[in-house]
Amino acid sequence: VRVKTADGETVPLAKPITYRDLFRHTAGFAGYDGLYHQDGFWGKTTRAKSLDWIIRELAKVPIEHQPGDKYTYGMSTAVLGRAIEALSGRTLDQFLRKELFRPLGMKNTRFHLTKRNRKRFQPLSVFEDGDYRAAKPAEDELPYAKEIPLYLGGEGLTSTMADYARFCQMLIDGGKAPGGIQLLKPETLKLIWTDQLGDIPGYDDRKNGNGFGLGFYVLNDFNQYGAEGVFGWGGYHTTHFWIDPKNEMYAIY
């Protein structure tokens, strides 16, 4: 991996990319609409057959800045997904099913919609000309509705409100699944909902009293978005969730 400079040249990494950099999006990987879109990278991902292939192609494209120098929301979570595959010896799909979904009883969460679940998929609406109208069939918009062997770390899962509630409850319960199985250590949870950016530039939402933990936004102060310590994130088609660990509350919408 090399680093893009202001004059269009590239230089070597000044320091290694860490897992913390990947979780807090300070590794330097841009999003699909940034440098990788310009280099035709998005087109490559739609034809990819494995996460390993995507990450190898990603490594050929210069990153935006030196690791740790700036917050740049991008493909870091996809890289984390590949790291899980390399460390576990399993695909990301296999790992999540065994280590997370089964212990939590998340039976309707998967990377690809089955024929049965495709019929259950929530219809989408769009707001145009002052009114709502039905969007085109949802499955036509979603690449993960098709049976392709591609599992990305940061996108692609389909789920239900009930399944995602199980995930949120696990985080409130100190990382424990029903039956007492410890999925995440309490120390890990504290890192997740603690601001990891500090004075690192690039995170525009800091002006609203928000920070960024390990993979989620976090509220550093009580504000219009919620209480201090609340963390959460959004998903496809304006879905969202937040968790308040201190008051043991969560919301999914």
Each predicted region: which residue ranges?
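Residues that cap or initiate secondary-structure elements
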Residues: 222-223, 247-249
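Short acidic-glycine loop/turn motifs at beta-strand connectors
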Residues: 128-129, 244-246
